[in-house]
């Protein structure tokens, strides 16, 4: 499986999310977040992005570390009810 991770310099959460992804057998493509990358990402997903990391899995913008962690765990019991 592949994940694209948009990162910034000296970003602890970026390092953590890359470790989480690697531990779950993802291949990582890392992109440094700069003005052009930010503009491309916001245009592609029609969303305002203010933080890094930002992770894309299966052409879906998952979000930052906590969103990726929740994505790895799958739906919770309460989500299955609804």
Q: Predicted regions span which residues?
A:
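Local sequence-structure signature of Cys/Sec-based thiol-disulfide redox active-site neighborhoods
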Residues: 1-27
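Alpha-helical elements of the RecA-like P-loop NTPase motor core of helicases
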Residues: 15, 39, 70
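Short alpha-helical
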Residues: 12, 36, 63
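C-terminal alpha-helical interaction module
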Residues: 2, 7, 43, 75, ...
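Structural micro-motif
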Residues: 45-55, 65-66
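Thioredoxin-like thiol-disulfide oxidoreductase module
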Residues: 32-49
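Non-catalytic, surface beta->alpha helical segment in thiol-disulfide oxidoreductase systems
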Residues: 57-82
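Conserved beta-strand scaffold positions in the cores of enzyme catalytic domains, especially
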Residues: 28-30, 61
